[in-house]
C-alpha cells in the first residue's frame, strides 16, 4: 500500500469517527457500514432471477458458462465470492449475463450494474439501511480502484449507492 493510500484511509477513518462518512465493510463496527456490504444477504429479483445477495450476482457475472453462473447466483456472500474468484474474467475484460457478453468498460455493463443495484434497493430492509446513512459520504476503502482488476470499483459502488440514496430521499 502506498503512503498516499495509507493517508487516505486514515483520513476516511477520521471522517467516519466524526460521523461524516461511512466506510462500507463487512468487518465494520458501524451497523450501516457492515449491512451495506455486498456480502450481506438481502433478497432481490433482477431480470427474472432471484438473488440472496448482490455479491452472488456480481460474482456470477464472471462465469461464461450459464450453468456455472447460475450455481454462483445461488450462493450467498462469501460463498459466491469464493466461486467467482476462480473465473479469470480479467484476461478478456468480459463479463456475462446468461450467455450474453458485456465488455467491462462498456456503457452497457455500467448500466447493467446500476440496474442491478436499483433492483436491490427494492428490498425494503436494504433501502432502510441505505437511507439511514443520511447525507454521509460513502467510501469502500477495501475495494479496488482499477476497473481492469475488479468488476466494481470503489468509485462505481459508492457513486451508485449515493445516486440511489439521493433518489430515495427525494421520493420521501
What kind of region is each of these model predictions?
Residues 1-172:
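Charged, low-complexity intrinsically disordered segments
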